[in-house]
Each structure stands twice: as C-alpha cells, then as structure tokens.
C-alpha cells in the first residue's frame, strides 16, 4: 500500500466548504498510511446513516476514483476496511475499558442500532466491488 498522509478522522464534521474549495480541519489523528483508510471511514460514517445503501456506496467510491484512481490493491484494502465490524469493536472496547459491571441504556441502544444495520451492511458488502 502507498504510504501517504491520512487525516485519521475523515468524516462530514471535519470537512469545510469555502469559496476557494473544499478542505479539512482537525488533524489531531493524522498519520502516514494508505488513504483508503480515510475513504473507508468517510464512507462508513455516511453509509451507516443511509442504511448501507449499495448504490450510494458505489457512487461515493466511483467519484473518489475519478479524482484519485485506486489500484486493484487499494480496492481490496477498501473492501477489507469496510468489512471490519468497527461499530461493534468500538462498543465492546468502550465497555471493556470502562470497568463497569452494567451497560447503560444509551449503550444498549447503540448495540441495538448496530444490530439493526447488520443485514443491510452484509448486503452492501456482497454488492461492493
């Protein structure tokens, strides 16, 4: 994989639109790595909010690919990153590191939301690439 500068927290909250163009802010998590990590994070955040719509995911990846052509290896890496259950990992990691003996109602709701997205996510992955 190409090692390039990655934003590290590439989501809609860190994008700014100006008259001069589009830019990013908040580089607290920047690092060197494959930029498909940033693309994956951005796509995942948007697609979770759109029930993992395969058509939206395809359009997002195609538009990115128009501006910066992805190699076969980068397409594979993107699919691999999108295949990882980040949301579950984040919830389980938070619970395990909090050292609490109970799960808050809010976290139960987050687990339920993640579970509700499981089937749409699997359908998306089957149709992607």
Region annotations inferred by a language model:
Residues 89-129:
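ATP/Mg2+ or Mg2+-diphosphate-binding catalytic cores
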Residues 73-74:
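Conserved ATP-binding subdomain of kinase catalytic cores across diverse folds
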Residues 1-37:
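Active-site acidic catalytic loop and adjacent metal/ATP-binding pocket
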Residues 24-25, 59, 81-84, 113-116:
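Alpha-helical structural elements
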Residues 36-69, 82-100:
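Active-site activation/catalytic loop segments of kinase-like enzymes and analogous catalytic loops
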Residues 9-11, 27, 69-70, 113-117, ...:
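Short flexible/disordered coil segments
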Residues 11-14, 26, 51, 65, ...:
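Detector for Asparagine
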């Amino acid at each position: 994989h190409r090692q390039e500068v990655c934003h590290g927290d590439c989501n809609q909250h860190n994008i700014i639109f100006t008259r001069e163009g589009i830019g990013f802010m908040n580089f607290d998590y920047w690092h060197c790595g494959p930029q498909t990590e940033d693309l994956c994070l951005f796509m995942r955040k948007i697609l979770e909010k759109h029930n993992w719509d395969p058509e939206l995911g395809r359009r997002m990846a195609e538009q990115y690919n128009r501006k910066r052509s992805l190699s076969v290896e980068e397409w594979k890496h993107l699919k691999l990153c999108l295949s990882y259950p980040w949301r579950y990992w984040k919830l389980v990691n938070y619970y395990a590191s909090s050292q609490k003996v109970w799960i808050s109602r809010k976290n139960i709701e987050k687990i339920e939301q993640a579970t509700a997205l499981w089937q749409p996510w699997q359908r998306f992955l089957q149709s992607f690439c």
